[in-house]
Amino acid sequence: MKMANPKYKRILIKLSGEALAGERGVGIDIQTVQTIAKEIQEVHSLGIEIALVIGGGNLWRGEPAAEAGMDRVQADYTGMLGTVMNALVMADSLQQVGVDTRVQTAIAMQQVAEPYVRGRALRHLEKGRIVIFGAGIGSPYFSTDTTAALRAAEIEADAILMAKNGVDGVYNADPKKDKTAVKFEELTHRDVINKGLRIMDSTASTLSMDNDIDLVVFNMNQPGNIKRVVFGENIGTTVSNNIEEKE
């Protein structure tokens, strides 16, 4: 089948840490990472410029640790290191399927990754390399969703692809608990904020809205879905400033 022109030419894919854990839900499952890497490689081979942000929830969660008595700042820094571990594993899997990949971190660790430098990240993308951003934004209290929105704005990405485990979009209620839940095909960023739809945290949603970055929430467990989103197929939920607000 002949493919149309891509809707998005430069994307930032946001993966949860749990996406790397496979069925176990914790830790890192190498076969799962390799499967995701092949999906990304297929899209990259079509000339799409790709950056990644990966959460760290498969290895560590700062908020529960803080609630249990750990200093919140230290707990968040620990989580940032978890995102770097995930980034290094994903980078290795992408390298193994033939994709030149760089990891850039917001906390200096020169032995394993480049420091985050916007201009260098842009050059990597222009040269056909994938860039994975690790260690959040380098400061506590900010989520990896906010990292994704910030880095997407900085690299002038056309869209953030929120790749979800077994969730095929945004609903007005939890579809696992409410059989009458209705999926939204389209939303504005303001819809998301006003309705309290927790796709991303409010900081990330506002950043995406202010910088006019589309957000697509889709099920990553269906093979080929990343490509479908990039080429504009109507899957998942698209959040954009260029959509009429829902009542």
Curated annotation (Swiss-Prot):
| Keywords per UniProt | Allosteric enzyme, ATP-binding, Cytoplasm, Kinase, Nucleotide-binding, Pyrimidine biosynthesis, Transferase
Gene3D superfamilies of this UniProt entry? Acetylglutamate kinase-like
Predominant cellular place of this UniProt entry's protein: cytoplasm
Binding of ATP, residues:
14-17, 57, 61, 165, 171, 174
Kindly report, in one word, the top-level EC class recorded for this enzyme.
Answer: transferase
Modulation of this protein's activity: Allosterically activated by GTP. Inhibited by UTP, 5-bromo-UTP and 5-iodo-UTP.
Q: What is its EC number?
A: 2.7.4.22
Concerning CDD domains, the annotation shows: AAK_UMPK-PyrH-Ec
- Give the NCBIfam families listed for this entry: pyrH_bact
User: What HAMAP family is this protein classified in?
Assistant: PyrH_B
Please report the name of this protein according to its UniProt entry. Uridylate kinase
